[in-house]
Amino acid sequence: MKRVWIVGLLITLLAGAKFGYEYFYFDQNQVGINGYVNPPAKIITLPQIPADGLSSIVVTPEAVQQALNDLGIPAGKVDGKWGQRTRQGFCIWRELTGRKPDRNYPIEFEQREIILLSKTKKSFALNEDFVKGLNVNKACQSVIWVKDGARKDYEISIVSTGASATPTNVGTFKVGWKVNRWYESISIPDGWMYRPMFFNKGQAIHGVESDNYVWWYPASHGCVRLLGAFVDKLWAADFGEGDTVRVYGEYNPVTTDPKI
């Protein structure tokens, strides 16, 4: 009788442990704490040697940063220090490779993949969600400017969208009007906008007095802050009235880095 009781207790404890693991490690959609779906073996398991050149790649923080920049993904200085700009780059890379866009550090396999992509000079295939125009991702604080209907010609840059108290609205909009000079906001005294293009009432894409104000987090009064040189490119390409601005995603300040 005592032996039966002990066996029953062990079964109960094992069942409880399994429930606890599944409840706390995965959410209701079976998405792991690092964003990996249940997590797929191809992401968390290193390849056998050799496997498409992945295993022979020497991984360093500097090499990963350089690879992101070579892929056209802004990732800050190549200094071996993974700061907030590098996190932005990881987020953009995840979006472009069909992963959940977050700013967590990549695991070793992903670092190897980033470097391999840059060495093979492969381009990303944008899916049909991307519109011809500006695609502003609030999760990454980034913009992908798609210049053609085939989604082959595009350029990536960084942005700073509206802070939590004054968020940039999510949706697909059209530029209604633009001003080709410095323009002071009507609602924000001394709020100067460089060559703004208004797409949603008072919300505009525009440059700022210093590119340093294009933070890696949402910090504007509702507009989409852009780098000055990027704004100049938009004007030079005659981007404006009737062109599309798509705003999507949600910024998450929390990062959960894997052990690497």
Please give the residue ranges for each predicted region.
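Second-shell loop/turn segments in exported
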Residues: 49-57, 74-80, 100, 129-132, ...
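Exported/periplasmic cell-wall-interacting domains
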Residues: 23-32, 167-170, 182-260
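Acidic, Ser/Thr/Pro/Gly-enriched interdomain connector segments
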Residues: 13-78, 172
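Sec-exported extracytoplasmic/periplasmic mature domains
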Residues: 66-74, 91-99, 148-151, 180, ...
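Short acidic, glycine/serine/threonine-rich helix-capping segments at coil-helix boundaries
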Residues: 52-61, 69-115
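Gly/Pro-biased beta-strand-loop elements
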Residues: 121-214, 259
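N-terminal Sec-pathway targeting helices
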Residues: 1-13
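Intrinsically disordered, low-complexity Ser/Thr-rich linker and spacer segments
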Residues: 42-57, 98-133, 258-259
